[in-house]
Amino acid sequence: MDKSKALSAALSQIERQFGKGSVMRLGKNDRSMDIETISSGSLGLDIALGVGGLPKGRIVEIYGPESSGKTTLALHCVAEAQKKGGICAFVDAEHALDPVYARKLGVNVDDLLISQPDHGEQALEIADTLVRSGAIDVLIVDSVAALVPRAELEGEMGDALPGLQARLMSQALRKLTASINKSNTMVIFINQIRMKIGVMYGSPETTTGGNALKFYASVRLDIRRIGQIKERDEVVGNQTRVKVVKNKLAPPFKQVEFDIMYGEGVSKMGEILDLGVKAGIVEKSGAWFSHDSQRLGQGRENAKAFLKANPDMTAKIEAAIRQNSGLIAEQILAGSPESDADGEEPMEE
């Protein structure tokens, strides 16, 4: 039996039945080879992700404790997409989006589509319709924990309805996943952390909404607040660590640290300084920072202020970091803990 003839007959039958392009050779499908990305708003995180940003046409999950910077990171991604002329939507299931803060992060709130649904089914139906339109570049669902099933809303307080939210998420993701890929829309699910009862070994932490999202997500980011940034006695920001817990596009388990300043978001200047020093692009001698024999300032805060006042110098250093990121990514992210043998490492506090 001639295998090539049999294959040709099978392919032509499939194309007659389901349309041209139902089956194709992977190498001839250029779109599947090139991954289009949108910057996360953090240069270090873009490098940690291995593809220069968060992938379009995929599902991304950002989870962490309260006030760790989940919504901030998602809004930075919206701002970056809007800079490229993209259309973004925000499904605000928590009814807690602050437009003033979003504007400070660089989001064009006049062009941002927002929905504040009454229940989980409505939220996911709206998300599905927007994704199927093919016009949306980034869609954010904030948050999975707030997607309350209609049956729970209509029931009494204290009613036991086990697995209802997990079933809702599982069904929604089955419907959404093909549309997301075809429309090349990035869908970011923000999620919260809960504690599992009776866990003796390993981390007791888990995310809400069942296991479906863990499987369907191409990228999962664990974001944690690890310290405070103070000016004298006043707290002006958080030191934040993001760990790439899952990555279908590049090696996972990389982690990166950056500052989130109140009212400003991710501190781009601080990140450029830190990454520049690790890459050898910015020289640090004692407390002085310099680049190409040009002094940037004494102390980190003064050097950040200098970079903020000199955007040309900032752009030059950032370009050098991006250019070398392929070579220095491993050094920048050195010290990332190795994964466990089963592929999922325990989450840190």
From Swiss-Prot:
GO terms for cellular component: cytosol. InterPro entries: AAA+_ATPase, DNA_recomb/repair_RecA, DNA_recomb/repair_RecA_CS, P-loop_NTPase, RecA-like_C, RecA-like_N, RecA_ATP-bd, RecA_C_sf. Keywords: ATP-binding, Cytoplasm, DNA damage, DNA recombination, DNA repair, DNA-binding, Nucleotide-binding, SOS response. Its main location: cytoplasm. Can catalyze the hydrolysis of ATP in the presence of single-stranded DNA, the ATP-dependent uptake of single-stranded DNA by duplex DNA, and the ATP-dependent hybridization of homologous single-stranded DNAs. It interacts with LexA causing its activation and leading to its autocatalytic cleavage. HAMAP family: RecA. CDD domains: RecA. SUPFAM superfamilies: P-loop containing nucleoside triphosphate hydrolases, RecA protein, C-terminal domain. It holds the Pfam family RecA_C. SMART domains: AAA. ATP binds at G64, P65, E66, S67, S68, G69, K70, T71. It comes from the Bacteria. Belongs to the RecA family. One of its GO terms (biological process) is SOS response. It is found in: Cytoplasm. This is Protein RecA. GO terms for molecular function: ATP binding; ATP hydrolysis activity; ATP-dependent DNA damage sensor activity; damaged DNA binding; single-stranded DNA binding.
